[in-house]
Amino acid sequence: MNLNATLIAQLVVFFILAWVTMKFVWPPIVKALDERAKKIADGLAAADKAKADLSLAEKKVVDELRKARESAGDVRASAEKQAAKFLDDARAEAARIIAQAREAAEAEAGTAAQRAKEALRDQVAHLAVAGAEKILRREINAQVHADLLANLKTELQ
């Protein structure tokens, strides 16, 4: 019976130990496990939220980059258009200045040609008068008259 009494005593001690454990030890352990499980769940939820926020931020960045590229393309096209307009205006201004200079040069050349013609007319008239004077001063002789006309001809050339 010693064995039975020992067994019963061990059973009583075991149940007392189990009861003390269930009453005083088990609740803090369960509480700590529940808190740890809650922290893990909160951490996973925060990680999922952060992942979703990261995905949303990446989409926003992609959209902003696309908008920036489009804006840069528009700015570039506008700058090219302004440069082309500036070049066209400069070419038109240069063509106008060249045409104006050409007209002025042609007018000047025309005026110079007119002055040269008038000077030539004056010289021809003077030579004709001088030739007529020489002819009239000398006797009218066919040979002398022909020589004078030949001299006049060479002077005019």
From Swiss-Prot:
<comment type="function">
    <text>F(1)F(0) ATP synthase produces ATP from ADP in the presence of a proton or sodium gradient. F-type ATPases consist of two structural domains, F(1) containing the extramembraneous catalytic core and F(0) containing the membrane proton channel, linked together by a central stalk and a peripheral stalk. During catalysis, ATP synthesis in the catalytic domain of F(1) is coupled via a rotary mechanism of the central stalk subunits to proton translocation.</text>
</comment>
<keyword id="KW-0813">Transport</keyword>
<dbReference type="InterPro" id="IPR002146">
    <property type="entry name" value="ATP_synth_b/b'su_bac/chlpt"/>
</dbReference>
<dbReference type="GO" id="GO:0046933">
    <property type="term" value="F:proton-transporting ATP synthase activity, rotational mechanism"/>
</dbReference>
<dbReference type="GO" id="GO:0005886">
    <property type="term" value="C:plasma membrane"/>
</dbReference>
<keyword id="KW-0997">Cell inner membrane</keyword>
<feature type="transmembrane region" description="Helical">
    <location>
        <begin position="7"/>
        <end position="27"/>
    </location>
</feature>
<keyword id="KW-0406">Ion transport</keyword>
<dbReference type="InterPro" id="IPR005864">
    <property type="entry name" value="ATP_synth_F0_bsu_bac"/>
</dbReference>
<comment type="subunit">
    <text>F-type ATPases have 2 components, F(1) - the catalytic core - and F(0) - the membrane proton channel. F(1) has five subunits: alpha(3), beta(3), gamma(1), delta(1), epsilon(1). F(0) has three main subunits: a(1), b(2) and c(10-14). The alpha and beta chains form an alternating ring which encloses part of the gamma chain. F(1) is attached to F(0) by a central stalk formed by the gamma and epsilon chains, while a peripheral stalk is formed by the delta and b chains.</text>
</comment>
<comment type="similarity">
    <text>Belongs to the ATPase B chain family.</text>
</comment>
<keyword id="KW-0066">ATP synthesis</keyword>
<dbReference type="Pfam" id="PF00430">
    <property type="entry name" value="ATP-synt_B"/>
</dbReference>
<dbReference type="GO" id="GO:0045259">
    <property type="term" value="C:proton-transporting ATP synthase complex"/>
</dbReference>
<dbReference type="InterPro" id="IPR050059">
    <property type="entry name" value="ATP_synthase_B_chain"/>
</dbReference>
<keyword id="KW-0375">Hydrogen ion transport</keyword>
<dbReference type="GO" id="GO:0046961">
    <property type="term" value="F:proton-transporting ATPase activity, rotational mechanism"/>
</dbReference>
<keyword id="KW-1003">Cell membrane</keyword>
<keyword id="KW-0812">Transmembrane</keyword>
<comment type="function">
    <text>Component of the F(0) channel, it forms part of the peripheral stalk, linking F(1) to F(0).</text>
</comment>
<keyword id="KW-0472">Membrane</keyword>
<keyword id="KW-1133">Transmembrane helix</keyword>
<protein>
    <recommendedName>
        <fullName>ATP synthase subunit b</fullName>
    </recommendedName>
</protein>
<keyword id="KW-0138">CF(0)</keyword>
